[in-house]
Design a protein with these regions (language model features):
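Short, low-complexity, intrinsically disordered N-terminal modules
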Residues: 1-3, 21
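Non-heme di-metal
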Residues: 26-207
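Serine residues within intrinsically disordered or low-complexity segments
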Residues: 13-14, 33
């Protein structure tokens, strides 16, 4: 698919030290011939429905804060509808695979975001005299890089069958009831609530 890119100015405001990014510097415009393909139409629909879902979720929070519970509920309900629509178009794009395939897809997307997208946006913002916005792009890029690292570790775990089995005794916790088991492998079933092994994860204390 061929794309042309059109630059626009980057504007930002700050409040209490928080940078508000009001515009991303590039806007893709598809060739007219590409607009007529089913795949491109599905991509446009998926992007639009995904954006609407997030937007309505944000709107619902504002409505709750302002005391409009019914309006918040309507925004939330519509957001769920948009999520269902997005899934429809994403499936049409063959975007959902096995867990291992999905992890590889996610890692690839995160790599693009930090290595190319945010890095490029940061350079452009710096060149155009917006050091604060450049720093914001760089910081978000660092987060996306950590996301890629996490996905790659999970890919490695799945590839060598160490999701539920380790080389030495570790502590496993049931995500359903909180039972903690010690061993090289997670229990096939939780001895307390009987949930399957898939509910176990390594204990991670961050307090």
């Amino acid at each position: 698919m061929h794309c042309r890119f059109k630059k626009k100015k980057v504007y930002f405001s700050s409040c209490c030290g928080t940078i508000l990014i009001t515009y991303i510097t590039k806007e893709a415009r598809y060739e007219q011939s590409d607009r007529n393909t089913d795949r491109t139409k599905s991509q446009i629909c998926f992007s639009g429905e995904s954006e609407a879902r997030n937007k309505y979720t944000f709107f619902a929070k504002v409505a709750k804060q302002e005391g409009y519970e019914q309006i918040a509920a309507i925004f939330e309900e519509t957001a769920l509808n948009e999520k269902a629509h997005a899934k429809l178009w994403f499936e049409a794009l063959s975007g959902i695979g096995s867990t291992l395939e999905n992890l590889k897809n996610a890692a690839s997307g995160e790599n693009y975001e930090w290595a190319e997208m945010y890095a490029g946006f940061a350079r452009t913002a710096a060149q155009e005299g917006f050091p604060d916005i450049a720093a914001a792009f760089e910081k978000v890029g660092e987060i996306e890089r950590s996301h890629e690292d996490r996905y790659n570790q999970l890919i490695d775990n799945m590839s060598v069958n160490t999701v539920f089995a380790k080389d030495s005794d570790v502590r496993w916790i049931c995500r359903n009831c909180g039972h903690i088991s010690v061993g090289a492998e997670a229990p096939l079933n939780c001895p307390v609530c009987s949930h399957p092994q898939s509910y176990f994860e390594l204990v991670s204390e961050n307090y």
